[in-house]
């Protein structure tokens, strides 16, 4: 009985220690609730805390793609050749192969619906020549729309040093997506 009790308390202590250490490293809750029609904010918490945006990054990837399409830099029917870099991205992905050719419209769908990292990288490389150049363009676009605390380092959102945004900045981007390029909703 004594041995069972000691085992129970040891297991409980280890679990509590593990959970508390995980909690110490958890990102803070951050949110902004805005009426996109008028910009009125109804809820805000840690709105300007810089956090990793994860797959929300793909909103900017698509925004820049739509911008490039509108500027006649590329078309929805342009064939994109998949690079070794894009094909090597970790999941979530659609398992694109190096050298494969696929229309931009299908890469956009894969990035938007499947959150495909390989598709997002291929989009960036097709538009700007490299992931690094595309990331710089994403950051410039963010600044131009008032996203002052956002820096992009890739097109897909996987964690990378310096790849950060805020809830407020993502709200700004979401609003721009809704109003600047509604013609691409049913792509």
Give the location of each predicted region.
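A penicillin-recognizing enzyme superfamily signal
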Residues: 184-187
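Active-site-adjacent loops and short helices of periplasmic peptidoglycan-processing enzymes
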Residues: 22-168, 175-182
């Amino acid at each position: 009985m004594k041995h069972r009790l000691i085992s129970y308390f040891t297991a409980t202590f280890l679990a509590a220690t593990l959970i508390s250490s995980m909690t110490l490293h958890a990102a803070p809750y951050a949110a902004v609730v805005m009426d996109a029609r008028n910009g009125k904010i109804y809820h805000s918490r840690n709105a300007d805390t810089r956090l990793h945006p994860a797959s929300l990054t793909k909103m900017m990837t698509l925004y820049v793609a739509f911008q490039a399409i509108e500027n006649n830099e590329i078309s929805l029917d342009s064939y994109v050749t998949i690079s070794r870099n894009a094909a090597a991205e970790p999941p979530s992905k659609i398992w694109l192969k190096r050298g494969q050719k696929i229309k931009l419209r299908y890469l956009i769908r894969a990035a938007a619906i499947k959150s495909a990292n390989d598709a997002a990288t291929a989009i960036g490389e097709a538009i700007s020549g490299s992931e690094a150049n595309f990331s710089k363009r994403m950051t410039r676009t963010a600044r131009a729309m008032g996203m002052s605390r956002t820096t992009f380092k890739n097109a897909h959102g996987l964690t990378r040093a310096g790849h950060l945004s805020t809830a407020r900045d993502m709200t700004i981007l979401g609003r721009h997506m809704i109003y600047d390029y509604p013609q691409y909703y049913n792509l």
